Amino acid sequence: MSKEPPNNSREKTKNLLLKLQDNICKNLENIDGKAKFTEESWLREEGGGGRSRVLKNGSIFEQAGVNFSEVYGKELPQSIISQRPEAKGHEWFATGTSMVLHPKNPFIPTVHLNYRYFEAGPVWWFGGGADLTPYYPYLSDVRHFHKEHSNACEKVNKKLHLVFKPWCDEYFFLKHRNESRGIGGIFYDYQDGSGNIYKGSNKDGNAYKESNNIGELNLNWNNLFALAENCGEAFLSSYQPIIEKRVSQNYTKEEREFQLYRRGRYVEFNLVWDRGTIFGLQTNGRTESILMSLPPLARWEYGYKAKQGSREDLLTKIFTRPQDWQNDKVLEEFCLENNIFD
């Protein structure tokens, strides 16, 4: 089967991502039980547009944003040209659905999802992923999230998750803090079926090493479309059980304050390091939609240090570091001993 996109590639990916947005919003409204999404449709002067949906002040979600966009133009931003110079001079098309959920309860993690598709002349690729940012450490929740996304990847190829997991650890890393944004998940970009899976720049990282060991997988357009479809569908099964397990847990003012403090790291990553934010701002995207990922409340505290051995301390020391969450028996024993397994 040809690796090249079908003639209806743009319409097909657009419809997939619209359906993903609709499905997520419908289910999140049912889960929350109180608030509803409001929708704003918008147009981009240079070409394209989208629809932004936001749910605020729900029973579970303090804020939830689910965006769809379909944009196109003639002038590519420098961030794309530097990665794929052969795209220069071609008209381009990009579509994507992105989501960030900020729950009220500190025991329910923040979650992020993004799946996207890009074309410019002979150049095309899929990208995407999902990642979890807990504020309090529970290894069982982390394992469940990773397992669901591992299963979704393996439906296309059993080797994909071996690269996408460490690639996610690498991408969602705050270099200025020397810590991960959360416990990771999956991340992939520039996937067009050619070359090795890993397309990042860190040749010292585990994603690069795993990708080199695996070699080329010869995936075609349909395989990569199915990957986006499978992973998008895995979101609810990866996250809803965590909500159901944690939503009835009472929390203190201090635990809420720690959640807001850790949300500050989320803000720092999105404004300083996130390529999607940078791309959106460089291409004159809709600013309100681009910054929808930011939490409604966050706080910073100079020189904060958690009490040694506290759950806040264990979150900071262990759950902001890349780990083999699913298979590390030493980590499992440590979490059981310190009451942070379940």
Curated annotation (Swiss-Prot):
Subcellular location, record wording: Cytoplasm
Residues annotated to bind substrate: S98, N114, Y115, R116
Record site feature (Important for dimerization), residues: H176
Major enzyme class: oxidoreductase
Region of interest: Important for dimerization: 266-301
Domain of life: Bacteria
Sorted UniProt keywords: Chlorophyll biosynthesis, Cytoplasm, Heme biosynthesis, Metal-binding, Oxidoreductase, Porphyrin biosynthesis
Enzyme Commission (EC) number: 1.3.3.3
Pathway: Porphyrin-containing compound metabolism; protoporphyrin-IX biosynthesis; protoporphyrinogen-IX from coproporphyrinogen-III (O2 route): step 1/1
One Gene Ontology molecular-function label: coproporphyrinogen oxidase activity
Reaction equation(s) it catalyzes: coproporphyrinogen III + O2 + 2 H(+) = protoporphyrinogen IX + 2 CO2 + 2 H2O
Binding locations of a divalent metal cation: H102, H112, H146, H176
Entry-linked InterPro entries: Coprogen_oxidase_aer, Coprogen_oxidase_aer_sf, Coprogen_oxidase_CS
CC terms in the record's Gene Ontology section: cytoplasm
GO biological process: one example: chlorophyll biosynthetic process
Main location: cytoplasm
Subunit structure: Homodimer.
Role noted for this protein: Involved in the heme and chlorophyll biosynthesis. Catalyzes the aerobic oxidative decarboxylation of propionate groups of rings A and B of coproporphyrinogen-III to yield the vinyl groups in protoporphyrinogen-IX.
Family: Belongs to the aerobic coproporphyrinogen-III oxidase family.
UniProt-recorded name of the protein: Oxygen-dependent coproporphyrinogen-III oxidase
Origin organism lineage: Bacteria, Bacillati, Cyanobacteriota, Cyanophyceae, Synechococcales
Gene: hemF
